[in-house]
Amino acid sequence: MSKSAVSPMMQQYLGIKAQHTDKLVFYRMGDFYEMFFDDAVEAAKLLDITLTTRGQVDGEPVKMAGVPFHAAEQYLARLVKLGKSVAICEQVGEVGAGKGPVERKVVRIVTPGTLTDSALLEDKETNRIVAVSPDKKYIGLAWASLQSGEFKTKLTTVDKLDDELARLQAAEILLPDSKNAPQLQTASGVTRLNAWQFAADAGEKLLTEYFGCQDLRGFGLDGKEHAVAIGAAGALLNYIRLTQNLMPQHLDGLSLETDSQYIGMDAATRRNLEITQTLSGKKSPTLMSTLDLCATHMGSRLLALWLHHPLRNRAHIRARQEAVAALESQYKPLQCRLKNIADIERIAARIAVGNARPRDLASLRDSLFELAQIDLSANGSSLLETLKAVFPENLSTAEQLRQAILPEPSVWLKDGNVINHGFHPELDELRRIQNHGDEFLLDLEAKERERTGLSTLKVEFNRVHGFYIELSKTQAEQAPADYQRRQTLKNAERFITPELKAFEDKVLTAQEQALALEKQLFDGVLKNLQTALPQLQKAAKAAAALDVLSTFSALAKERNFVRPEFADYPAIHIENGRHPVVEQQVRHFTANHTNLDHKHRLMLLTGPNMGGKSTYMRQVALIVLLAHTGCFVPADAATIGPIDQIFTRIGASDDLASNRSTFMVEMSETAYILHHATEQSLVLMDEVGRGTSTFDGLALAHAVAEHLLQKNKSFSLFATHYFELTYLPEAHAAAVNMHLSALEQGQDIVFLHQIQPGPAGKSYGIAVAKLAGLPVRALKSAQKHLNGLENQAAANRPQLDIFSTMPSEKGDEPNVGNFVDKAEEKHFEGILAAALEKLDPDSLTPREALSELYRLKDLCKSVS
């Protein structure tokens, strides 16, 4: 379109829009943000606001939509959640200062990953932006949180990119426009940047200038070895500068993260363990929602971070444990005080980018004074000593804010009443002129009534017409000659006098001057706070850590969590362990033991559907995870050896977007585990092979279990319905059979959820189907077919020889296939003997005795 054919204001808009073609432009016009042309159409649809027209361009009506300035946050929040970026264009010039339109410019760009406004953010979630820079060998990652000042980088590989993004939970991902990452093809929140912005040399130059250093070796970054990571960090920092229209001063020193710092968990594991999100995508009930007793939002965010980043450094874990133990008698008063603490972390971020509001500073002031009053007994905890020493360091900042900001300032700076009385003499004088106006008006009204003798005379004020003298219609004709008519009403006339006009000019001028001066003073306070940002961030981190540690103490005291022990030898010993989430959802939870060590590395877990196999496996993984966060664990006792990674293969789901079936997803996850698990890994495998035919599934399940035993040698919990797999312990001493018990009462079934030695006698699938409400006719038919299949299987035992067709790596036949056929009876006799030997009749309750009797009976049937 021709710019000469449009108004000067529209020319200005088109020039700004041309620089931000990929964003919606909020163009400030008075008390509204307006959008034009395609932006207006899109915004009207997304925000459900009115689409209208105004004027014409090239003969076509200009489409237009707008949102009120004071309500812009709620609309921005909706757009950001939809993955949109918005350029905020403000009026920066004085209205009427020149012949053309008022000067406007984009003051910031709101993108999903660069939010700082509390109204646009989830209180308990960390908002991160991640830069991804793929190279031939490695992928450079850099991520930051403008709210916390976090700034980190890492080298990773293509096969681990999904896992890293799942861990970081990025709100926005930056990617070079010349590079492709298959994992990001369907991802939302991806922003493409020019590839040159990811150049390592440009990145190093920008980073060294920002941190004021000669090179990046002090951050653990080598220019050659970490070039791709440095490029990602540089691109990220530059993007933040462009979107915020300034270089924020609160980003922590850049740090290089390595795999050895935390226990590794892939994307499937984080999903299956439901750490911060359920399998259905909800926020509750999850591990996070169940454990989150934090008093502050900062604490809740740090808790989520710790849960997703379990430590491997035993010294750091023990430091947290000692702090938790020291707080067990102090956590209640501490949490009461922490409830009065504002979100210092996010307030500091808003100070850094220059958009903090008056009440942010008031909340910061009150919080700093509150933190300084925290009095804790460290009880030998060096971590507590370090944390509590931080708070007095901010008292000088708190005192400066007390002097500068009113106890209860206005919400908006434009409304005035923000700067404290006595802070600036000129402001106090301007306020005196405004505030003593009532006395002048009362005196003027009394004097004018006496002078004119008009009883209906009143001196008043409104925002539209300013100050005026009002007379009734009957007395208006008697107004003195110096009364100048200002407004005519139905029953009254309004006048102005030279004396009243002079006072009005003085008051209005004082008001304008006071507002301008308050803005100037407030900006000065914000500028002075820039130097205090490192200490403010330090206080925020210390308060959040205290909040999480006191939450861990509350869990230990109120939910009977115990301090786990750590061993240098391979072991996972848990006495009466409980699932931390499930036990809060049910009236009675059955606790269970877990014993894995160098002799028994794989637990083959059998039992009925709904018997609790998946819950038990997740329980073990969550106890291990919690132990490495420094939290006490839901058990009577726990001893855990070295753990480097946790893997899970639980549940069934497809990936239609990538054209992968349920079985393909299952096999992909299984393959990843077999390629990456080590002797120090914990592996959870649930129903491997169920997505294909019986023989294929059984063969695959056997092969996977054997691979875990012989190659990976990981600690493994392997749940299966393939009863044939229960022969594995006879061939592999490191495998052990355990089962979840159930009790049959006629045609009904009672799940005892108790882990017992040996394999399960049956799966109770039809009984579970009955509980699910299958029609009686279908159940009878299923039972009939089951009886026929069992009879056929009994008459044709050789079908178990399926493994004999599978060549081993050495070319000979696998020993398990022949063993199943030849030693079946001996195996069952061994199981019966072992089960009887472990029974102590004198210690069993009637219910347990009956359960054991039924179990032994089922085993005897199998032998016969």
Swiss-Prot record:
CDD domains: ABC_MutS1. Disulfide bonds: none annotated. One of its GO terms (biological process) is mismatch repair. ATP binds at residues 607-614. Transmembrane segments: none annotated. This protein is involved in the repair of mismatches in DNA. It is possible that it carries out the mismatch recognition step. This protein has a weak ATPase activity. This is DNA mismatch repair protein MutS. The gene is mutS.
